[in-house]
From Swiss-Prot:
Keywords from the UniProt entry: Membrane, Transmembrane, Transmembrane helix
Chain ranges on the Cytoplasmic side, renumbered to this chain: 1-24, 79-122
Main subcellular location of this protein, as a coarse class: membrane
Isomerase keyword on record: no
Subcellular localization, as worded in the UniProt entry: Membrane
Membrane topology: Multi-pass membrane protein
TM spans (from-to): 25-45, 58-78
Protein name in UniProt: Uncharacterized membrane protein YOR376W
Species per Swiss-Prot/TrEMBL record: Saccharomyces cerevisiae (strain ATCC 204508 / S288c) (Baker's yeast)
């Protein structure tokens, strides 16, 4: 029963890539939607194209390079009225999580708190 509940909480896994002139990193995000809050876990790794090395996305090598985890707790008020703080990761284009599980490409500059994609719990 608990395993089934946990599997229902994991709604979406997506890859986010920031499209700047020289991308600094790629990020993989895991979204967990709980009753009163949501948790986004971002795993960020440096883009090795900057260093001229071949990029290898195997999980063991990512851990060897130093994986940085970011957790974002989204209270009920923010879930209903506020977006994911995407300006932490990219200031141009980003794929955002919508409440129905779809992905939307934003084309604005720095992500404002006044509008954008809301994350809503189950």
């Amino acid at each position: 029963m608990k395993n089934r509940k946990f599997s229902n909480l994991l709604l979406l896994r997506l890859r986010i890539l920031c499209f700047n002139k020289k991308p600094a990193f790629a990020a993989t995000s895991y979204a967990f939607f709980f009753r009163n809050f949501s948790v986004l876990i971002f795993i960020m790794v440096p883009d090795e194209k900057e260093n001229g090395a071949a990029a290898d996305n195997s999980f063991s090598l990512l851990i060897g390079r130093g994986v940085v985890l970011f957790l974002f707790y989204c209270p009920t008020a923010l879930k209903m009225h506020g977006p994911v703080p995407a300006h932490w990761f990219c200031d141009k284009n980003i794929e955002a999580i919508q409440s129905d599980g779809q992905i939307r490409l934003l084309r604005s500059g720095p992500f404002p708190w006044s509008h954008g994609t809301c994350i809503r719990g189950a």
